[in-house]
Amino acid sequence: MIAMPTLLSADQRQTLPATLPHWTVHEQSISRELVFNDFNEAFGFMSRVALLAEGRNHHPNWSNVYNRVSITLSTHDLGGLSDLDVELAAAIDQLLPA
């Protein structure tokens, strides 16, 4: 049985800059901009994220222009930022070099 996502409380949202320092917190989403060496590196990263997202059945809004990837996470069914977004953001961060 898959757990239902829950919207983050105001207190939980306030802790996000400490737990996800590379992400920007918005009213109903979080976002991150990434720059890679070239298109192949950016696309390879997106492929790895796609596998993570598919495994969680939670998919980012994103775009790619050459070596840049823009990611926005929000739980549309709930109309805002949920625990699923935080979990996916943390998993995405784990794909990147420290």
UniProtKB/Swiss-Prot annotation:
This is Putative pterin-4-alpha-carbinolamine dehydratase. It comes from the Bacteria. It catalyses: (4aS,6R)-4a-hydroxy-L-erythro-5,6,7,8-tetrahydrobiopterin = (6R)-L-erythro-6,7-dihydrobiopterin + H2O. The keyword Cytoplasm does not apply. It is an enzyme of class 4 (lyase). InterPro entries: PCD_sf, Pterin_deHydtase. Its EC number is 4.2.1.96. Keywords: Lyase. Belongs to the pterin-4-alpha-carbinolamine dehydratase family. NCBIfam families: PRK00823.1-2, PRK00823.1-3. GO terms for molecular function: 4-alpha-hydroxytetrahydrobiopterin dehydratase activity. One of its GO terms (biological process) is tetrahydrobiopterin biosynthetic process. CDD domains: PCD_DCoH_subfamily_b.
